[in-house]
C-alpha cells in the first residue's frame, strides 16, 4: 500500500484555490520527517527502481507556492502567496524575508504572489503577482552585488486585466535567451464565459513570450484553462492545465525557442479530448500528453517539473491537489503511463524544480524535498 500523508480539506482549480489553514509565522529550523515508498508500490508490477523514493519535510512556510534557484547562489528562494520571498540555506530559512510586496497583493482566493524566476545572470528577480485590483502583474526587482533584493527598484513589465477572481495561473520561467515565458489562465469564472482562451485578440488562456525590457508580448500557444504551474526543460514547456468538469491535463509545448505559429491546446472547445463548448472551434488542437478523469485520482492537477537527478531523472513529476497523489511520467515517449509514487500528500499546490532538486509544496505550509 502507498504511504498516505493526510489530505487537508482545501480545494484548487475546478473549484478554485481556497484559503488553507496554515501555520502561524515561519518555521526557521527545518524538520527531519521522512516518508518512504514501500517496496512494490511504484505502480509498475515487478519494477523496484523507485523503491527508495522518499519525501523529506525540510520546513514550513505560510502558503508556499513556488521555489527558484539563482545563478552563482547556493541558497533557494521560496515564495509565500501572501507576498514574501524567503531564503533557505543550510537546512533552514532566514528569519526575515528577502522581499516583501504584501502591500501590493492579497494572498486570498487564487490571488497573491504566485511566481518567481531569476534572470540567467542572477541579477534580476521576475515576479508574477495579482495586484490589489486582481490584475496580473509581471514585475522585475534588481538584486545587487551583495545579493540584496532592492525593493525600491521594483518596476512593472506587463499588466494584464483579469475579468474574474480565479484562473490567474501565475507561473513564469526564463528562457536561455533571457525572455520570459508566462502562462495565463482564461480569466476565470467557469466554462470560459468570455470565450477568451481561443480568442487571438486576448492574452488570456495563452502562453506568452514577454520581453523583460519593454514588455512586448508574443503569443506562443492558446486554448488553456488554468495552467497553474509550468516547467521549461530541454526546450519543451510542460503545462499542468487544471480542468473544469471531468479532466485534468498535462500538455507539452515542443521546441519552444522555434515556435513559428500559435499552438492550440483546445480549451474551451475541448476539455482534454472531450467536446466542451459547442460554439468554440479548435479543429487542430494538440491533445494533452496525459489526461486523467476526476475521481479517485483527484480533481485539480498541480504541476509539475522534470527531475534532473536520481531515480526519476528525465521524468515529469506532478501531483493532484485534491487527492494528494504524486505521479511521474516518462518524457521521451508519446503516450506515457502515469506511475504513482505517493498518496495523500497534504494539499500539494505545486511540484517545482530548483537547481537539481524537486520540491512538493503544500498550501498548508509543509515543504517536502523529493529524495532518491
Segments from the language model and where they lie:
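Beta-strand-rich domains and repeat architectures in extracellular enzymes and scaffolds
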Residues: 54-83, 299-306
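Conserved beta-strand position repeated across blades of beta-propeller domains
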Residues: 68-69, 117, 173, 231, ...
Amino acid at each position: 500500500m502507498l504511504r498516505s500523508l493526510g489530505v487537508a480539506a482545501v480545494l484548487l482549480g475546478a473549484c478554485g484555490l481556497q484559503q488553507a489553514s496554515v501555520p502561524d509565522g515561519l518555521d526557521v529550523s527545518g524538520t527531519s520527517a521522512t516518508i518512504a515508498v514501500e517496496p512494490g508500490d511504484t505502480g509498475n508490477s515487478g519494477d523496484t527502481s523507485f523503491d527508495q523514493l522518499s519525501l523529506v519535510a525540510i520546513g514550513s512556510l505560510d502558503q508556499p507556492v513556488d521555489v527558484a534557484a539563482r545563478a552563482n547562489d547556493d541558497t533557494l528562494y521560496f515564495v509565500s502567496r501572501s507576498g514574501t520571498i524567503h531564503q533557505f540555506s543550510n537546512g533552514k530559512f532566514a528569519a526575515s524575508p528577502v522581499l516583501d510586496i504584501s502591500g501590493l497583493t492579497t494572498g486570498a482566493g487564487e490571488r497573491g504572489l504566485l511566481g518567481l524566476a531569476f534572470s540567467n545572470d542572477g541579477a534580476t528577480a521576475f515576479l508574477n503577482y495579482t495586484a490589489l485590483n486582481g490584475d496580473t502583474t509581471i514585475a522585475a526587482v534588481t538584486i545587487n552585488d551583495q545579493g540584496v533584493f532592492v525593493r525600491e527598484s521594483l518596476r512593472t513589465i506587463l499588466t494584464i486585466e483579469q475579468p474574474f477572481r480565479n484562473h490567474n495561473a501565475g507561473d513564469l520561467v526564463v528562457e536561455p535567451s533571457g525572455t520570459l515565458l508566462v502562462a495565463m489562465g482564461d480569466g476565470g469564472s467557469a466554462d470560459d464565459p468570455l470565450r477568451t482562451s481561443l480568442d487571438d485578440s486576448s492574452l488570456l488562456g495563452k502562453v506568452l513570450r514577454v520581453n523583460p525590457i519593454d514588455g512586448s508580448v508574443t503569443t506562443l500557444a492558446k486554448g488553456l484553462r488554468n495552467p497553474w504551474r509550468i516547467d521549461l526543460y530541454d526546450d519543451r514547456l510542460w503545462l499542468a492545465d487544471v480542468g473544469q468538469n471531468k479532466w485534468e491535463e498535462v500538455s507539452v509545448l515542443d521546441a519552444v525557442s522555434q515556435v513559428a505559429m500559435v499552438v492550440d491546446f483546445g480549451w474551451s472547445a475541448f476539455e482534454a479530448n472531450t467536446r466542451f463548448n459547442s460554439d468554440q472551434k479548435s479543429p487542430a488542437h494538440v491533445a494533452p500528453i496525459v489526461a486523467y478523469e476526476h475521481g479517485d485520482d483527484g480533481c485539480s492537477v498541480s504541476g509539475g517539473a522534470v527531475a534532473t537527478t536520481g531515480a526519476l531523472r528525465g521524468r515529469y513529476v506532478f501531483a493532484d491537489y485534491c487527492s494528494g497523489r504524486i505521479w511521474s511520467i516518462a518524457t521521451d515517449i508519446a503516450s506515457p503511463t502515469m506511475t504513482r509514487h505517493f498518496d495523500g500528500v497534504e494539499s500539494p499546490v505545486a511540484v517545482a524544480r530548483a537547481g537539481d532538486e524537486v520540491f512538493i509544496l503544500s498550501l498548508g505550509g509543509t515543504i517536502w524535498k523529493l529524495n532518491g
